UniProtKB/Swiss-Prot annotation:
GO cellular component, one term: plasma membrane
MF (Gene Ontology): DNA binding; pyridoxal phosphate binding; transaminase activity
Source organism of this protein record: Saccharopolyspora erythraea (strain ATCC 11635 / DSM 40517 / JCM 4748 / NBRC 13426 / NCIMB 8594 / NRRL 2338)
PANTHER family: 3-OXO-GLUCOSE-6-PHOSPHATE:GLUTAMATE AMINOTRANSFERASE, TRANSAMINASE
Residue range(s) of DNA binding per entry: 160-179
Keywords: Antibiotic biosynthesis, Cell membrane, DNA-binding, Membrane, Pyridoxal phosphate, Transcription, Transcription regulation, Two-component regulatory system
Role played: Sensor protein that transfers the signal of environmental stimuli to the regulatory region of target genes to activate or repress transcription of erythromycin biosynthesis genes.
Protein name per its UniProtKB record: Erythromycin biosynthesis sensory transduction protein EryC1
Modified residues (N6-(pyridoxal phosphate)lysine): 186
BP GO terms, sorted: antibiotic biosynthetic process; phosphorelay signal transduction system; polysaccharide biosynthetic process
Length: 366
């Protein structure tokens, strides 16, 4: 039995009629950029995130970069980032001219450890950039308190956690700005790249609107040096359709995660993901830690089960960041995770039969 890591076609087929209708509506309108679909989605997504303002952008990386720019983070500043994350978190910091300062994760959710964050603050620190990794919220209350105590901006990377909750509130509602990705494989995925920033600050939202459109509010009048980071109308229309199903899809992910937890709890050589009692994960990924990860991945692959590694190389050891001079051993927790983590298939369209095949195959190979 073949089990893909994520079945994007199944997501489309479930909503085919509504998605096709939304696309035809845009195509028939003749308005393909920053029109009524974007305006409607911004209002709907802001409300979903329990926030006041939403600004759509071209990608999750755009969302991070423009959030930092709008907050005044730039050349000579430092931004605290996780040592264990996707490189986009670091790239956004670099793109605005600041320096990423990595901090190791805590042991339950592998998100930023607040105690280590406080130790990493220097006079040059301008912002803290936590990632809600694998769908699990970072400890926003602790990080917000640290940011307030030191006069720092707090920008959430919510690329993997749309719909997750932190102490009952949606992630994205407890910071200066929160950046979302609508990459197709995300819990709320477009038909291509897309992103958004949510914030309670109207001035910050307007600044990001300016930056995303060449620094212009009025055609050919450019107030600042902006960029092109616009979301097209087709993507906004599709996201509006999918947003109505997001909570149901996340609930299906949670059910599958619970099934994995129950069936795999006694398997030797693996450690199951944990959650804090104050967190409701969006279960974007179901990530094991494995004593013999590469062997187990090969065994699953041979049985038709597609797995992925999030992430095989710590960012500080990537050639892109060789200039930081952080040799192997600099961040042992991130380096250990890179050698142990394995992501199993999980998604709203994974059948129980497919999940049971994953479970049986994993047990046989452990």
């Amino acid at each position: 039995m073949d089990v893909p890591f994520l079945d994007l076609q199944a997501a489309y087929l479930e909503l085919r009629s509504d998605i096709d209708q939304a696309c035809r509506r845009v195509l028939g309108s003749g308005w393909y950029l920053h029109g009524p679909e974007n305006e409607a989605f911004e209002a709907e997504f802001a409300a979903y995130c329990e926030n006041a303002h939403c600004v759509t952008v071209g990608s999750g990386c755009d969302a991070l970069e423009l959030s930092l720019l709008a907050l005044g983070v730039g050349q000579g500043d430092e931004v605290i980032v996780p040592s264990h994350t996707f490189i986009a978190t670091w790239l956004a910091v670099s793109r605005v001219g600041a320096v990423p300062v990595p901090v190791e994760p805590e042991g339950v959710s592998h998100t930023l450890d607040p105690a280590l964050v406080e130790q990493a603050i220097t006079p040059r620190t301008a912002a803290i950039l936590p990632v809600h990794l694998y769908g699990h919220p970072a400890d926003l209350d602790a990080l917000r308190a640290i940011a307030d105590r030191h006069g720092l901006a707090l920008v959430e990377d919510v690329a993997q956690a749309v719909g997750a909750r932190h102490r009952g509130h949606r992630v994205g509602a407890g910071s200066n700005a929160a950046a979302f990705s609508f990459y197709p494989g995300k819990n709320l995925g477009a038909l291509g790249d897309g992103g958004a920033v949510v914030t309670t600050d109207p001035a910050l939202a307007e600044r990001i609107r300016l930056l995303r459109n060449y620094g212009s509010k009025q055609k050919y009048v450019h107030e600042v040096r902006g960029t092109n980071a616009r979301l097209d109308e087709l993507q906004a229309a599709v996201l509006r359709v999918k947003l109505r199903h997001l909570d149901d899809w996340n609930a299906r992910r949670t059910t599958l995660a619970q099934h994995y937890q129950t069936e795999l709890k006694d398997v030797p050589g693996i450690t199951l993901p944990e959650t804090h009692p104050w967190a409701d994960s969006a279960w974007h990924l179901f990530v094991l830690r494995c004593e013999n990860r590469d062997h187990l991945q090969r065994h699953l692959t041979d049985a038709g089960v597609q797995t992925l590694i999030h992430y095989p190389t710590p960012v500080h050891l990537s050639p892109a960041y060789a200039d930081l001079g952080l040799p192997p051993g600099s961040f042992p927790v991130a380096e250990s995770l890179a050698g142990e983590v394995l992501s199993l298939p999980i998604g709203p369209h994974l059948s129980r039969e497919a999940a049971d095949h994953v479970i049986a195959t994993l047990k046989a190979g452990a």
